[in-house]
Amino acid sequence: MAAFKDACFHYRRITKLNRELLRIGANSSWTPAPPSNIRGWCLECCQLTNLTYCYGCSLHHVCQWCVQYGRCFLDDEPHLLRLRTVKSPITTEKLASIVKMYQLLFPINHSIVKKFVKSTKQHKCRNDFELSWYNQLVLPITLTAAAVHCDDCIYYIFGHYEGKANQSNLPYRFVNCVDEYDRLLLDDVNFDRMAFLPGRLQKYYAKRYFIASRIPSAQPAKLTYSDFSVKTLINSGAYARRRIIYRSVTNFHWQSHEDPLNDLLLDKDKILAALMTNERRPFLTHNLNFTSLLHELSELVHHAKPCYLHSFHVQPASKVHCHSCSVAFDFHTVDWRIRRIYDDVMYFLRACCRSNVSSGSCSSLDPMDAVVKAALLEMFTESFKHHAHLLFHCFDPVQIDDVSYILFNYPVNYDIYDFIIRTLATERLPFTLSYKQFTTILFALVERWYDLSQIERLPLSIAPTNRLIELQERGNLAEEFDLLLSSSDSEED
């Protein structure tokens, strides 16, 4: 097992380039790391072990040994993990560069085999060509990669991943890219490497190669908010939660993601110079993204009390102290605007409910409560239009000239009063609301705080390093969420 890790340990003594590139944390002394129950493959050393979160992207893809070097596949520094990473789309030229990189860093020829045999025989009590002592020589060249599916692209991290484990809780899936290359050509490359090995090691090499090169591909799954660690989140002030990440940057810049790999094959001195100028740079990013909004909203809706719609409370829904209406939820754990949306929507729906439905008090149960909870859960999705239609018909609308109306004569506070007047572009608050007016107000209460069309789906911790540097230089890295407020909020100021 862990042939890739053993190969990095033994091959790092071959050349100066290997000495710089093949130094991984799994072959160094262990340092304390945050524990985790997630079992998977470390993308840096390829061994199957317990994973912890990466300091560069907050994903669980690094083991407790390799995390000490703080390397991420999104770094700007051309370390081994970065060189093994290819950005979609996959082409034959990119795969050919991966094969050449393996041949450059992990060569197998007569001199290499002789060197390892000599270094092994100088120790006693070792049988000739035992797999445990020549594990580095049976590292096959395969095109199996761990695919991390972001919104706009897929990152393929190539390596030799051994063993079996459940991939459902991992941020990546394994894909076999051999069909995009040439299966027969890859077989020929590995057969040439096997020819230099002793007969006993050839059997091990052939078995590993055919097992690894014939595995089926899994469908890459898009990242979700649960894939990102919450341990990199910090509270910054009363209203913002930010994420601290670290990326390795250098003085050298490349135009495309694969340029460092091409320079490794054509200009090794540039790679060595870039490795000498690397530094770890912190980035304090905002945590506003669509997946986090859905995650926080689902937690809030789980504790929501729709019976507030039947109450006479003066306080907002999030601050009321009532056995039936109070929300047992810590609002400091979610974005402050979600709390405002929850209060505004519940306040508006209560006015509609008290104007049309004969309900007793907040302690009474109503079939409408399930409809309200379902609508709150879909506030940020396209399904909200359908749930708004169901909500409107819960208020017993009356049809006049093929237009449905509900009453709206229950008192509202000045904030909602002024907002409805500006939303409907009218001079006074109407006593009846049509279906179009009802949905316009309901959608505007959500869009008042978020311009969902401008919010990215995933956290900025998965963004490329060059984009983080650009945002940091413009001063929009930590304060970028201010730019995502809707235009209606700007007009209010």
From Swiss-Prot:
InterPro entries noted in UniProt: Rotavirus_NSP1 (IPR002148)
Region (RNA-binding): 1-81
Region annotated Zinc-binding domain, chain positions: 42-79
Renumbered residue ranges of the record's region Important for cytoskeleton localization: 82-176
Cellular location(s): Host cytoplasm, Host cytoskeleton
Main location: host cell
Region feature Interaction with host IRF3, mapped onto this chain: 319-493
GO MF annotation, one: metal ion binding
Sequence motif pLxIS motif, residues: 483-486
Assigned GO CC terms: host cell cytoplasm; host cytoskeleton
Keywords from the UniProt entry: Host cytoplasm, Host cytoskeleton, Host-virus interaction, Inhibition of host innate immune response by virus, Inhibition of host IRF3 by virus, Inhibition of host IRF7 by virus, Inhibition of host RLR pathway by virus, Interferon antiviral system evasion, Metal-binding, RNA-binding, Viral immunoevasion
Residue spans crossing the bilayer: none
Coiled coil: none
Pfam families: Rota_NS53
UniProt record, GO biological process: symbiont-mediated suppression of host cytoplasmic pattern recognition receptor signaling pathway via inhibition of IRF3 activity; symbiont-mediated suppression of host cytoplasmic pattern recognition receptor signaling pathway via inhibition of IRF7 activity
Description of how the protein assembles with itself and partners: Interacts (via C-terminus) with host IRF3; this interaction leads to IRF3 degradation. Interacts with host IRF7; this interaction leads to IRF7 degradation. Interacts with host CUL1 and CUL3.
UniProt note: domains: The integrity of the zinc-binding domain in NSP1 is important for degradation of host IRF3. The pLxIS motif targets host IRF3 for degradation; however phosphorylation of NSP1 pLxIS motif is not required for its activity.
Role of this protein: Plays a role in the inhibition of host innate immunity by inducing the degradation of key host factors required to activate interferon production such as IRF3, IRF5 or IRF7. Associates with components of cullin RING ligases (CRLs) including CUL1 or CUL3, which are essential multisubunit ubiquitination complexes, to modulate their activities.
Protein family membership: Belongs to the rotavirus NSP1 family.
Protein name in the entry: Non-structural protein 1
